[in-house]
Regions:
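Interaction interfaces in information-processing and related assembly proteins
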Residues: 17-113
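Cys/His-clustered metal-coordination modules, chiefly Zn-binding fingers
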Residues: 109-170
Length: 170
């Protein structure tokens, strides 16, 4: 990260509760919650949107364009006092299949999860076929994952294929 040279800027960071050490901003550890790591840098805002976390009252930290040996650049999300439900993990897997989830309790990582693309996807993704029954009636969408890297889904009703690039979440 770029060192902050202005003492005025440094004072602002100190007043806002950040700790300055070795010319880097240190983000505090979370006591309880979820850390989503290894998000491709260009998928950060997709993950934020698909998980609907902008509407939460929980404290959150987002890091973008961080160095990563695996991804080149990555993003990270820390959410205090929030643990992802199965459907949220499935949504995450569709948007950022390389993501890793760390469950934090009492400041310790108590569980590490690798995100896996599910075999079946229900009620999460919209069918791209405008003639599909799911776009005209109150029918829950159902897809089979045909390919998981890059992700390709097949609609249960009309058999239309949808790739990851064109996926639209419900």
């Amino acid at each position: 990260s770029t060192p902050i040279k202005s003492s005025a800027a440094s004072d602002v960071y100190k007043r806002q509760g950040f700790i300055m050490a070795k010319k880097e901003l240190q983000v505090s550890a979370i006591e309880n919650g979820t850390v989503i790591d290894h998000i491709p840098a260009d998928k950060l805002f997709d993950v934020i949107n698909v998980l609907g976390i902008t509407g939460m009252d929980n404290a959150m930290t987002f890091g973008a364009n961080l160095k990563s040996s695996k991804l080149g650049k990555k993003a990270i999300i820390k959410i205090w006092d929030k643990f992802l439900e199965d459907d949220e993990v499935n949504k995450l897997a569709l948007v950022a299949p390389s993501a890793k989830i760390n469950i934090i309790r009492d400041y310790d990582v108590v569980e590490k999860k690798t995100v896996n693309v599910p075999e079946k996807v229900e009620g999460i993704v919209k069918c791209m076929n405008p003639k599909c029954i799911t776009n005209h009636e109150k029918v829950r969408t159902k897809f089979t994952v045909v390919k998981d890297s890059p992700i390709v889904l097949k609609c249960h009703y009309c058999e239309k294929l949808t790739d990851q690039e064109h996926m639209e979440m419900n």
